[in-house]
Amino acid sequence: KGFMPEYIRFAQYSANHGTQMEKFEVGSKNQFTLVHNPKPYAKNFEIRNLASAGEVWTGKGNKSRKMYSGDPMLFDENMNSCAIRLRYGKFTYYNGGDLSGGNWPELYKSHERDFETQVGNVCGKVTVMKANHHGYYETCNARFLEALSPQVIIIDARSKNHPVPSTMTRMSDPQVW
């Protein structure tokens, strides 16, 4: 059911036809590296893997912790998004795909859906961020926005209800963050 089984079939097909694949290593800062002439940029460039498949970096070494009990496949694919922080000199950029801020109190174990607060705590302040999940209802909670304090927020809208008014209010209200 849903997107994940089809994606897994696609990934397996791709691997069987020569595509090199590897697991996203939560906490790593060495998985994505510069290929051409990296030495001059070694101290100024980093991509840190913050979260993926139900795990969030702890902020220490390459250690991560699981965000929810049970099978991560029980949640939709959005909850399994990968999140990164890119640093280049003083510029920092955050992208968390479709991660959630857990703004669904009526759902069972809603607290397990709040990846944003934990990711925000380890990410820290950024210059630019991409709004999680197109700025939908369950994203960009106040704790997350305060932790990142971005100067610019990019919203990748793909339908007429992206972003939603409540998320825009959180993003634009200086009293929220």
Whereabouts are the PLM-identified features?
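Cap/insert and terminal regions of metallo-dependent hydrolase folds
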Residues: 1-2, 75-79, 104-177
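Flexible, acidic/histidine-containing loops and adjacent segments that form or flank the divalent-metal
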Residues: 1-109, 113-114, 173-177
